[in-house]
Each structure stands twice: as structure tokens, then as C-alpha cells.
Amino acid sequence: MSDTTAIANVFKLIEEYDIKFVLLRFTDIKGKEHGVSLPVNLVDEDLFEDGKMFDGSSVEGWKAINKADMLLMPMPETAVVDPFAQIPTLSLRCSIYEPSTMQSYDRDPRSIAIRAENYMRSTGIADEALFGPEPEFFLFDDVRFDVSMNRSSYSVDDIEAAWNTNKKYEDGNNAYRPLKKGGYCAVAPIDSAHDIRSEMCLILEEMGLVIEAHHHEVATAGQNEIATRFNTLTTKADETQIYKYVVQNVAYEHGKTACFMPKPITGDNGSGMHCNMSLSKDGKNVFQGDKYAGLSETALYYIGGIIKHAKALNAFTNPSTNSYKRLVPGFEAPVLLAYSASNRSASIRIPAVTNPKAIRIEARFPDPLANPYLAFAALLMAGLDGIINKIHPGDAMDKNLYDLPPEELQNIPAVASSLEEALNALEQDYEFLTKGNVFTQAFIDAFITIKRKEVERLNMTPHPVEFEMYYA
């Protein structure tokens, strides 16, 4: 869709749905969405040329207060009617621009994703990078947490939770709930959220996403997944933000709360965001070939780049301290940096396909707290580095990696074991990200500073488990 056609479509939607406000949405470094709403009478064609000024100093990691002015530049092709606004509202996703140069801001995650795609095209390796993330989430009935000088606690609860088998309910306990690790593809009445997910799917379709399936996930306490069709990198990152927005709002309307934390409960599976990837050139799948599992040599090199840079990638694909409570053996989390066909214990899997044209790779270590613009861009840059430098990943590992003896395990590299380790790796291994000025040094430094504050805060906070282990 050309800009002219896309802009015309914006005004068509405004008229068709009697839109009263236009919400300009943007994403910060941490992946959180923000928005500014404009009365519809202020929305004209000039908005798509001049943008809307806002205070960049109020967004963590962006501008100093003495250089705060920045521009929200709406992208007309992202226009979609907000299904949750009571007053008719049109949503437009924005990139961030510098008003002095009218160029994209180097710390804007969406602009980083666009630069990654442009860099890929400049190499001649591919025209399109296709991403298909699979974010998992929990639906809870009740979430509470308290952090102060003299106490620290949290609790989550859900009618599906295994710990509620003996709980007294006013209408009685019907006992239909998945036990620990017993929820995969459960059906009603054990799966209490089927209709909620179906409603999410219908709204996602209204907003332009293509739904492939939805189902209950492995964990107890309401773990779910909705699978959507792949798309090009930046567009899929946009769609991932829409996905989270819809899941959170539909849950809220049903008296539930959606949780995208990788490990909100102890002793059961966490939530991942497996990322399916392939490259396309002239309409052909670059990853299709005659090597292992139907991959091309280019695809193997792409895998090699991801494995080589995995610990640095973890800073973007697993950007929270909570992420590393998921990345431990025993809960279907892929911690070992190996690749294999259909082997879900490997961190990089080659899913089985019925059509060779659909061949792809799946990175299994990312989680849904990742900023999709940064995570997808970083994965692409690592893969491209592998292709350019012909980094072969070695032999595939087709055995169950969870059952390997210690002498074999020590020869297989692993993902980072903490956010601190991931940030240390990123400090040392970042040049593959700065090619083509995709990620700038200033952005990487700002990102590390923000994330180190999170690590330091957790490190300085006494934990209830410490009292259990050490108090008496």
C-alpha cells in the first residue's frame, strides 16, 4: 500500500466509523506502549508529514530534559479501529523522529526494526525477513504484590490453579482444573478460558491479524496460547503489540488479568515466545535447501550466527530478571544452544513441514516480555552475521538434551543464566548489531543502563525465600 493510498484509507475509516479521536501509539525501550489522543478535527494530511510533538524526556532512556522535543510520526498503513474504546477511536502506530533532522530517532525500537530490514536488503541476502512469534500468557483471577522496606510478597490465583483443588467456593468446587504440567490442549470444562480466547481471536482478526489456532498451554493456573500467521519483521512486531493489547483488554473485560511474565508461578512451565523465522528473496524461501532437515546452507549459517551471539541476544529476547527463572532445565525451556529437527529440547528447532517451501527455524529461548521490535531485529542481525561470515553451527543434536550425561552436557554451550550475564555478554559482543547503524552504541549503552538498574534493585531487595532458608 502506497503512502497516498494508506492516508486515504485513514480518512475513509474516520468517516466510516464516525471516529472522534485518533490515538498515536508508540513503544518505549522496555516494550511498553504509550499513546497521545488527538481530536479528529486536528488530523489532516499534514500530520503524516509534520508529525506530532511530544516530550521525549518523560520516556526512560530517551532524551534529556533540555533536549526533550521529539516527533511522533504516524504510519498510515497501521490504521486500525480500537475495539475497546467507548468513544470511536482510530489507532495509528508511530515511529519516533528527531525534529531537527526529520530522521528516525536512533533509540526508537520501531525505527531499529525498520533499519534492520533495510540493512538486510542492502546485503542482497534477502528481500524479506518473516517472523512468526508464539507468545504464551497466563489468565489470572487475582494478582497481588507488595514491596516496601519491611515486607516483600506476591500472590497469584486462578480458578484453574492446581492448588485450589481443596478450596471452598460458594457454589462448590467442581474439581475441573489441570494439575501441574497437565494443561496442554485441555478442553472444557477443564479449559475454562476457551471462549475468552475465541473472543480474543475474533477481535485480533478484526484488527488485521490472521489466526491459525488457539489452545490451553501446559501449565496449570490458566496458561494459554494463540497462534497467529507470520509476517514481515516490523509488521509482525506491530502485530505482537496489538496481540498483547487485545489479550490484556479482553481478559480485563472478563474480570481476568493477563500476565506475560515468563515465570509467574513456581514449579510449573513458564511462558515463552518461540520465534519462527525465514528469509525470502524474489519470492523464494532462502532457507529451503538440501542440507540437514531440508535447510539450505544459508539457513545453517543463520543458525550459527544465533548460536554464536546467543548470550548477547538474551539481553533483548529475555530482558527481565524473571526471564531466567524460566530458562532452567526441567520445564520444557530450551537452555542448550543446539539445533535439531522437531526436537523441542534444543534451543533452535526446525519444525516439521508438509510443504518444503514453508521450511523455517524456530528460536525457542525468547519470552513474551521481550520488546518485539528489538528482539526480532537482534535475531535478524545475528543471523545475517552468521550468513555473511559463514558461521556453521556444527552438527545437529537429535537426542533428548534433557537426558544427556554431565560429560556430554559440558561440551554444549548454554544461554545466559541471568540478566546480568546477558548484559555482560552484550557489552562485549555488540558489533554485529551496529552494522548498518541498525543499533547504535548510544542505544546499547542506554539499554544496558536501564536493565542494570533492574538487576541492582532485585539484588538489593530481601526475598521471602531467604527468610525461609536462613532466618532460623
Curated annotation (Swiss-Prot):
Biological role stated in the UniProt entry: Catalyzes the ATP-dependent biosynthesis of glutamine from glutamate and ammonia.
Binding site for ATP: E212, N276, M277, S278, R344, R349, K357
Species annotation: Pasteurella multocida (strain Pm70)
Name of the protein: Glutamine synthetase
GO molecular function: ATP binding; glutamine synthetase activity; metal ion binding
Catalytic activity reported: L-glutamate + NH4(+) + ATP = L-glutamine + ADP + phosphate + H(+)
InterPro entries linked: Gln_synt_N (IPR008147), Gln_synt_N_sf (IPR036651), Gln_synth/guanido_kin_cat_dom (IPR014746), Gln_synth_cat_dom (IPR008146), Gln_synth_gly_rich_site (IPR027303), Gln_synth_I (IPR004809), Gln_synth_I_adenylation_site (IPR001637), Gln_synth_N_conserv_site (IPR027302)
Top-tier EC class: ligase
GO cellular component annotations of the record: cytoplasm; membrane
Cofactors: Mg(2+)
